[in-house]
Amino acid sequence: EPVLRRIQRRIITCRRSDGVELSFTLCLPADHSPQQPPLPALLWAYPREFNDPETAGQVSGSVNRFNTLAGASHLFLVSLGYAVLDEVSMPVIGSPADANDSFIRQISDSAAAVIQAAAEIGAIDPARVAVGGHSYGAFMAATLLAHTDLFRAGIARSGAYNRTLTPFGFQNERRTFWEAPEVYMQLSPRSEEHTS
């Protein structure tokens, strides 16, 4: 665990294609230097809903706190030579009545911007990135794996992947399945599985 206490942490900010400000904490192994080759990475996030871009763009993390690890923390991957893009802001902006109509586009744009920002500073290899999350973050990870080519692998812990099984709403979705069946189907990554 001493290695994990010395994780290098850095707040990175960037913008997604629609101009929304994003931030994430770049976690690197204690002995990593900028002269070394880019690392494989894990992007770990949990999407959150916002009514406006200004609120969504606020930086919420800090490098001035202790590394706390519990259970099967994704930060253990740093000790194995991975970069971890942690506390990634993954905002879904819109009215509570219809924010999920653009959920896939918004999280895809956020993921692409964060990967590009970390790659541009030489920290990660954009061809070797995994995505992960827990609960709603797991749903996000499965959705990104189903709808983008940004990731090579994923960790989806305890998520809901078939929204037709939550017909009376989920997260901040207020419409029922019967009011917005196309949204429920689109947001069911289980129905988008591809085999190769």
Where are these regions (language model features)?
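Short amphipathic alpha-helix with an adjacent loop that forms part of the alpha/beta core around
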Residues: 33-36, 191
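Active-site-proximal cap/loop segments of hydrolase catalytic domains
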Residues: 63-196
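Short beta-strand element of the alpha/beta-hydrolase
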Residues: 28, 36-49
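Flexible, active-site-proximal loop/turn residues at the rims of small-molecule/cofactor binding pockets
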Residues: 31, 48-49, 91, 160
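Non-catalytic accessory segments flanking enzyme active sites
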Residues: 1-34, 72-75, 79, 117
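Serine-hydrolase catalytic-loop signature spanning alpha/beta hydrolases and amidase-signature enzymes
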Residues: 49-51, 84
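Short, conserved, GDST-rich strand-edge loop motifs in beta-rich repeat architectures
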Residues: 51-64
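Short beta-strand motif preference
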Residues: 22-24, 41, 85
